[in-house]
C-alpha cells in the first residue's frame, strides 16, 4: 500500500505496519480505543504494558505528556539526536487513556526521523502507536514481505525500507535515565 492508503486505514481505526529506524512497527491511531484494542489482540500483548508513541516532532505528543516538571535540560534531552533510536518514558497527562499507559502514570515517546513516520503523522494528523511488527515467538520484521508472511498477504503494510539502525530503540526514563531496554 502507499502512504495515502495507509493513512486511510489509520483514519478508519485499523492497525497498519510501517517502517521505522530499524524494524517495521505495528501502529494505529492512539486516540482510538478500538484501534488500540485491535493492536493488543494482534500482538497478544497485555494492556498493562503500555505502548510507545512515535512522531516526527514533539507537538504530536503534547496531548498525551505532562510537561509541567520538564526542565530545559529535559526538553533538550527529549529533542536531541542520538546515535541510536531512543525512546523516553515521560509523565503522562491524567487525561491520557489507560489503554495507552497501561499500569503506569507515564508514557513512552520517541521522536522518529524516518520519512515514512513523518509523512504518516503529517497526513493522519496524529502520533502513531509503535510496537514491533512480529508475532510473539518470531523476530521483528525488517521487510514488508516479512510482515505479510507473519500477518497475512492482505495486511496493510507500507512497503518502504526500514532505516539504518540495527537494533530497536533504547528505552530510558527522561528524568532518572534508568535504562529499561538496551538499544
From Swiss-Prot:
Pfam families linked: Sua5_yciO_yrdC (PF01300)
Domain of life: Bacteria
YrdC-like domain span: 1-183
Nucleotide-binding found in the keyword field: yes
Catalytic activity: L-threonine + hydrogencarbonate + ATP = L-threonylcarbamoyladenylate + diphosphate + H2O
Keywords assigned by UniProt, alphabetized: ATP-binding, Cytoplasm, Nucleotide-binding, Nucleotidyltransferase, Transferase, tRNA processing
GO CC term (a single one): cytoplasm
EC number: 2.7.7.87
GO BP terms, alphabetized: regulation of translational fidelity; tRNA threonylcarbamoyladenosine modification
Coiled-coil parts of chain: none
Compartment(s): Cytoplasm
PROSITE patterns: YRDC (PS51163)
UniProt-listed Gene3D superfamilies: DHBP synthase
Gene Ontology MF term list: ATP binding; double-stranded RNA binding; L-threonylcarbamoyladenylate synthase; tRNA binding
Cited HAMAP family: TsaC
Function per UniProt: Required for the formation of a threonylcarbamoyl group on adenosine at position 37 (t(6)A37) in tRNAs that read codons beginning with adenine. Catalyzes the conversion of L-threonine, HCO(3)(-)/CO(2) and ATP to give threonylcarbamoyl-AMP (TC-AMP) as the acyladenylate intermediate, with the release of diphosphate.
Record-stated family: Belongs to the SUA5 family. TsaC subfamily.
UniProt name for this protein: Threonylcarbamoyl-AMP synthase
